[in-house]
Amino acid sequence: MPRKGHIAKREVAPDPVYGSTLVTKFVNSMMWGGKKSTAQGIFYSAMTNLEQKGGDEAIKLFKKAVENCKPLLEVKTRRVGGANYQVPVEVNPERRTSLAIRWLVSYGRARGEKGMIEKLTNELLDAANGRGAAMKKKEDVHRMAEANKAFAHYRW
């Protein structure tokens, strides 16, 4: 246990275009090597494409995509009497959001299209419609938690 007090969470500034902290978090997680302006350029271009392809407001589709990818349960490994158990635990709201963002960014990058803008646009559109690799990851995590429901009493 750390001896020092609790570290306060940093306040995330809303982004300049949509005024949303969620967008800022997404751009920050997308950023590589401190190149925030590049990440913002990619994100806002993807949002423009998303609006054209999705037929709805881009920010609505983006929020829906993140909301759809948020996991409710996950498994954590717990060692009891020499055996390791995958114990299903509820995910706290902040971690839900960060996991959803992380999955959207990583599976967006892994897509086969050419260019990050196109990849991100299609991954967000798929997630908003309940498809895509990020949604599959969420379902896999839920399936693992469901399969290990018998060990839920090992929760701490």
UniProtKB/Swiss-Prot annotation:
InterPro entries: Ribosomal_uS7 (IPR000235), Ribosomal_uS7_bac/org-type (IPR005717), Ribosomal_uS7_CS (IPR020606), Ribosomal_uS7_dom (IPR023798), Ribosomal_uS7_dom_sf (IPR036823). Keywords: Ribonucleoprotein, Ribosomal protein, RNA-binding, rRNA-binding, tRNA-binding. One of its GO terms (molecular function) is tRNA binding. Disulfide bonds: none annotated. It comes from the Bacteria. GO terms for cellular component: small ribosomal subunit. GO terms for biological process: translation. It holds the Pfam family Ribosomal_S7. Belongs to the universal ribosomal protein uS7 family. Part of the 30S ribosomal subunit. Contacts proteins S9 and S11. One of the primary rRNA binding proteins, it binds directly to 16S rRNA where it nucleates assembly of the head domain of the 30S subunit. Is located at the subunit interface close to the decoding center, probably blocks exit of the E-site tRNA. This is Small ribosomal subunit protein uS7. It comes from Acidobacterium capsulatum (strain ATCC 51196 / DSM 11244 / BCRC 80197 / JCM 7670 / NBRC 15755 / NCIMB 13165 / 161). The lineage of its organism: Bacteria, Pseudomonadati, Acidobacteriota, Terriglobia, Terriglobales.
